[in-house]
UniProtKB/Swiss-Prot annotation:
Gene: IGKV1D-43
Name under which the protein is recorded: Immunoglobulin kappa variable 1D-43
Organism field: Homo sapiens (Human)
Top-level taxonomy: Eukaryota, Metazoa, Chordata, Craniata, Vertebrata
Compartments in which it is found: Secreted; Cell membrane
Complementarity-determining-3, as annotated region: 111-117
Complementarity-determining-2 as annotated region, ranges: 72-78
GO terms for biological process, alphabetical: adaptive immune response; immune response
Protein backbone atom coordinates (compact mmCIF):
# COMPACT_ATOMS: atom_id res chain seq x y z
CA UNK A 1 0.00 0.00 0.00
CA UNK A 2 1.42 3.34 -1.11
CA UNK A 3 1.03 5.91 1.68
CA UNK A 4 2.80 8.83 0.03
CA UNK A 5 2.83 12.08 1.96
CA UNK A 6 1.57 14.86 -0.34
CA UNK A 7 4.17 17.20 -1.71
CA UNK A 8 4.09 20.49 0.15
CA UNK A 9 4.62 23.11 -2.49
CA UNK A 10 3.04 26.39 -3.48
CA UNK A 11 1.50 24.94 -6.63
CA UNK A 12 -0.85 22.80 -4.55
CA UNK A 13 -2.53 25.94 -3.23
CA UNK A 14 -4.44 26.10 -6.51
CA UNK A 15 -6.40 23.04 -5.46
CA UNK A 16 -7.87 24.88 -2.48
CA UNK A 17 -9.72 27.57 -4.40
CA UNK A 18 -13.04 27.23 -6.21
CA UNK A 19 -12.63 27.52 -9.94
CA UNK A 20 -9.11 26.11 -10.03
CA UNK A 21 -8.68 24.15 -13.25
CA UNK A 22 -8.15 20.54 -12.32
CA UNK A 23 -9.69 17.20 -13.22
CA UNK A 24 -10.92 16.40 -9.72
CA UNK A 25 -13.18 18.88 -7.95
CA UNK A 26 -13.16 18.96 -4.16
CA UNK A 27 -16.13 20.16 -2.11
CA UNK A 28 -15.87 20.84 1.61
CA UNK A 29 -18.68 21.28 4.14
CA UNK A 30 -19.50 23.22 6.19
CA UNK A 31 -17.97 26.40 4.81
CA UNK A 32 -17.81 27.74 8.36
CA UNK A 33 -19.13 26.69 11.76
CA UNK A 34 -19.48 27.90 15.32
CA UNK A 35 -18.12 25.63 18.02
CA UNK A 36 -17.06 25.75 21.65
CA UNK A 37 -14.17 24.23 23.56
CA UNK A 38 -14.95 20.58 24.24
CA UNK A 39 -17.23 20.16 21.23
CA UNK A 40 -16.87 17.32 18.77
CA UNK A 41 -16.35 18.85 15.32
CA UNK A 42 -16.73 17.11 11.97
CA UNK A 43 -15.73 18.51 8.58
CA UNK A 44 -16.57 16.62 5.41
CA UNK A 45 -14.88 16.66 2.03
CA UNK A 46 -16.13 15.10 -1.21
CA UNK A 47 -14.20 14.39 -4.39
CA UNK A 48 -15.87 14.46 -7.81
CA UNK A 49 -14.37 11.02 -8.46
CA UNK A 50 -12.61 8.33 -6.45
CA UNK A 51 -9.21 9.36 -5.11
CA UNK A 52 -8.11 6.07 -3.48
CA UNK A 53 -7.63 7.70 -0.06
CA UNK A 54 -5.06 10.19 -1.42
CA UNK A 55 -6.59 12.89 0.73
CA UNK A 56 -4.79 15.30 3.06
CA UNK A 57 -6.09 17.70 5.68
CA UNK A 58 -4.31 20.94 6.54
CA UNK A 59 -4.73 23.41 9.38
CA UNK A 60 -4.03 27.10 8.77
CA UNK A 61 -3.96 29.93 11.28
CA UNK A 62 -3.92 33.64 10.35
CA UNK A 63 -0.61 34.82 8.86
CA UNK A 64 0.82 31.30 9.09
CA UNK A 65 1.61 28.68 6.47
CA UNK A 66 -0.75 25.69 6.29
CA UNK A 67 0.33 22.67 8.32
CA UNK A 68 -0.21 19.10 7.16
CA UNK A 69 -2.28 17.32 9.81
CA UNK A 70 -3.50 14.15 8.12
CA UNK A 71 -2.40 12.31 4.99
CA UNK A 72 -3.63 9.20 3.17
CA UNK A 73 -7.10 9.98 4.59
CA UNK A 74 -6.38 8.78 8.13
CA UNK A 75 -2.64 8.91 8.89
CA UNK A 76 -1.74 11.51 11.51
CA UNK A 77 1.31 13.64 10.78
CA UNK A 78 3.93 13.46 13.52
CA UNK A 79 3.14 15.82 16.39
CA UNK A 80 -0.56 16.16 15.62
CA UNK A 81 -2.71 15.52 18.72
CA UNK A 82 -4.71 12.28 18.81
CA UNK A 83 -7.98 14.19 19.16
CA UNK A 84 -7.71 14.70 15.39
CA UNK A 85 -8.72 11.82 13.18
CA UNK A 86 -9.46 11.29 9.53
CA UNK A 87 -11.60 8.70 7.83
CA UNK A 88 -13.22 7.88 4.53
CA UNK A 89 -12.59 6.22 1.21
CA UNK A 90 -13.58 6.53 -2.42
CA UNK A 91 -15.09 10.00 -2.75
CA UNK A 92 -16.18 10.81 0.84
CA UNK A 93 -13.81 11.87 3.61
CA UNK A 94 -14.13 13.29 7.12
CA UNK A 95 -11.94 15.18 9.57
CA UNK A 96 -13.02 14.87 13.20
CA UNK A 97 -11.80 16.75 16.25
CA UNK A 98 -13.04 14.74 19.21
CA UNK A 99 -12.82 17.52 21.80
CA UNK A 100 -12.09 20.99 20.48
CA UNK A 101 -9.29 22.86 22.25
CA UNK A 102 -8.56 26.62 22.14
CA UNK A 103 -5.53 26.06 19.89
CA UNK A 104 -7.70 24.21 17.34
CA UNK A 105 -9.59 27.32 16.23
CA UNK A 106 -8.31 27.68 12.67
CA UNK A 107 -9.17 27.06 9.04
CA UNK A 108 -9.04 23.47 7.79
CA UNK A 109 -8.59 22.44 4.18
CA UNK A 110 -8.85 19.14 2.40
CA UNK A 111 -6.66 18.44 -0.62
CA UNK A 112 -6.55 15.45 -2.94
CA UNK A 113 -3.22 14.29 -4.28
CA UNK A 114 -4.44 11.40 -6.41
CA UNK A 115 -3.92 13.53 -9.50
CA UNK A 116 -2.47 16.96 -10.23
CA UNK A 117 -3.57 19.50 -12.86
Amino acid sequence: MDMRVPAQRLGLLLLWFPGARCAIRMTQSPFSLSASVGDRVTITCWASQGISSYLAWYQQKPAKAPKLFIYYASSLQSGVPSRFSGSGSGTDYTLTISSLQPEDFATYYCQQYYSTP
